[in-house]
Amino acid sequence: MNETYAKECEIECIENGNTLNAEVDRFQKEKYLSVYMNTVKINLQYNTRNTSYIGKMAGLEFISKGPKLLGHHR
């Protein structure tokens, strides 16, 4: 069964606590998440310890729970 996910997700900067919406570029559940935030691409890898996607860009660390599941289809 296939799953459909949202095209946007929330991403939080760990250093300053700011939360932004980012456009999902590529996503594979529990593997990786690639997003565009204000035309800047950020790659996040899945972290099994806290079940989140974590990545770094320009000296800042970002965290996301990933895009929301919209539904299942065959």
Predicted regions and their residues:
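Cysteine-centric segments in proteins
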Residues: 1-74
